[in-house]
A protein has these predicted regions:
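C-terminal functional module detector
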Residues: 1-155
Length: 155
């Protein structure tokens, strides 16, 4: 269960310079395997989130996260749980994002994200150039233009 000010993921909050929010999140996991519970803001793990672990039974662990959060720019936030399984695979759950919007300010992507997506689109253009018609490539060209613009405003 993940909530901000008792609202569920997907909610969009309006922010100003003095808005504080209360994040609460809980997850139940088998304790046989290492588990991480993380608060993600704009794609990066928030380092100062405190996690409380409560043993519900010999094999079940309840993880709780409570945090006061503030944003000085438009942002998104989500919660992620990961667990390393004995076979080496990673099991994970990720909430939908909450949105915190400052008036007239879009959420700016990180440079590394915009660059990665631009490179992916350019690779797809190269890969399909000999196969698709110019009309069929228009969507890729529009995406390339979009990610080039995102790269200019990225943080």
């Amino acid at each position: 269960d993940v909530r901000v000010n008792d609202c569920y993921p997907g909610h969009e909050f309006k922010i100003d310079s003095s808005t504080e929010f209360r994040l609460t999140a809980t997850a139940t996991y088998p304790t046989d395997y290492p588990t991480r519970f993380e608060c993600i803001v704009n794609g990066e793990v928030v380092k100062n989130a405190t996690i409380q672990s409560i043993r519900k039974s010999p094999s079940i662990l309840l993880l709780k996260l409570e945090k006061k959060i503030e944003f000085d720019s438009s942002s998104w936030m989500a919660i992620r749980c990961t667990q390393k399984m004995p076979n080496g695979n990673i099991s994970f759950a990720h909430s939908a994002p909450f949105f915190f919007m400052k008036q007239n300010e879009p959420i700016r992507p990180r440079k590394v994200e915009a660059q990665y997506l631009l490179e992916r689109v350019e690779n797809e253009i190269r890969r399909h150039q000999q196969v698709l018609t110019p009309e069929q490539l228009e969507g890729y060209h529009a995406a390339r233009k979009f990610y080039r613009e995102q790269l200019k405003v990225a943080r």
